Regions:
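C-terminal helix-rich "cap/oligomerization" subdomain common to oxidoreductases
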Residues: 1-2, 71-74, 224, 299-332
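N-terminal Rossmann-like dinucleotide-binding module
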Residues: 1-52
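Active-site loop of classical SDR/Rossmann-like NAD(P)-dependent oxidoreductases
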Residues: 19, 41, 284-298
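Beta-loop-alpha module in the N-terminal Rossmann-like domain of NAD(P)-dependent dehydrogenases
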Residues: 20, 52-116
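Hydrophobic residues in well-ordered beta-strands that form the structural core
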Residues: 98-99, 124-126, 258
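Rossmann-fold dehydrogenase core element
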Residues: 110-130, 150-154
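Predominantly a Rossmann-like dinucleotide-binding segment in NAD(P)-dependent oxidoreductases
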Residues: 130-209
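Contiguous beta-strand/loop segments that form the cofactor/metal-binding neighborhood of enzyme cores
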Residues: 189-262, 294-308, 325
């Protein structure tokens, strides 16, 4: 990678696009060069906001050509990820891409993007930021140490109250991709990170709206070693104004319970230990949203600077879409 500052562009200026724009803009090695937003109203607004910042505002990604970009962030709706990324590659605009979760609308699209990305030979990443949580990271560290013995089973959940009280006629969940793509994908990725590749074995329950989009779902899965686990995902769970993700892991010598903010270790001998987020050096250089977002962006930048593929590459992240497709196939 070149010695000069990395030149970044961002496509899609919704909540996530603005978050990533703010974060990369404070990383010294990055220069935010251009933003792409198709909405005429938003385009005019951002031209006023960034008029003195030297950032180019465009309404078509074709206008990214000639800007000598090192990487582009794709933060458009999930349904457009595949077409936008393919266009970036086909037009030779950029080789390095960060895309918000999920990689694509389904596993077939994800496989196609992986194949194209291999041919382009760039660096790519998908935004499963929970892997950058100090709490979940500590849980994985404890698991790998081996002091808990053999991992026997796990439970995983992802809850929010976003659609609590809405009727089945509401299409709000569908507009965000459904509970699996919008919410459950994060805890599925955490499980893949902790336990390896998973195969769905059964769908226990599913609630869908009239658009056919799941609002809550429960399913079981297992890995090649025979480890079994259960997932519960809901966008209409009471008491979760902010989304929460959690895992419980039962081992032969104890168990781990972890969510976004705290971790507990309980040994069969009766010994207990607890950690909270603030106990685990959660500080970052710039805080916006959650600290995980800064670490995620810094990891992408560092991968570009050192010319190494990200752990959360298209290839690895496509396995989340693989699991989601299995669940949807069984629940249809």
């Amino acid at each position: 990678m070149k010695d000069k500052r990395l030149r970044f562009g961002i496509i899609g200026l919704g909540k996530m696009g603005l978050l990533h724009a703010s974060l990369v803009n404070v990383i010294p090695e990055v220069e935010l060069v251009a933003l792409c937003e198709k909405s005429a109203l938003m385009n005019r607004l951002f031209k006023k906001v960034f008029s003195t910042a030297g950032i180019k505002i465009v309404d078509d990604l074709e206008k990214f050509r000639g800007l000598d970009l090192d990487a582009v962030y794709v933060t458009t709706p999930i349904s457009s990820h595949s077409s936008v990324i393919k266009e970036l590659f086909a037009r030779g605009i950029v080789r390095n891409v960060f895309v918000e979760k999920t990689l694509a609308l389904n596993y077939e699209q994800s496989k196609e993007l992986c194949a194209i990305a291999r041919n382009v030979s760039g660096i790519n990443m998908v935004g499963y930021m929970k892997r950058f949580s100090v709490v979940f990271g500590k849980a994985k560290e404890l698991l790998l140490q081996g002091d808990l013995g053999e991992l026997q089973k796990f439970e995983a959940y992802a809850y929010s109250s976003d659609f609590l009280g809405l009727t089945k006629k509401s299409k709000s969940s569908a507009s965000r991709g459904g509970a699996l793509s919008d919410l459950g994908c994060h805890v599925i990725d955490l499980a893949l990170w902790m336990f390896g590749q998973l195969e769905v074995t059964d769908v226990l329950s599913a609630e869908k709206n009239e658009a056919g989009s799941e609002t809550s779902i429960a399913f079981t899965a297992s890995n090649s070693s025979g480890l079994t686990g259960q997932f519960e995902i809901s966008q209409s769970m009471k008491g979760y104004r902010m989304p929460e993700f959690g895992l419980s892991m039962e081992c032969s010598k104890g168990r781990i319970d972890v969510n976004d903010d705290r971790l507990s270790l309980t040994l069969n001998t009766g010994i207990q230990r607890r950690w909270h987020r603030h106990d685990l050096n959660d500080a970052v250089n710039f805080y916006l949203g959650d600290s995980e977002y800064y670490r995620e962006n810094f990891e992408f930048v560092n991968s570009l600077l050192t010319n190494r593929q990200c752990e959360l590459s298209f290839e690895n992240a496509s396995m989340v879409d693989y699991v989601i497709d299995q669940v949807r196939s069984r629940s249809s």
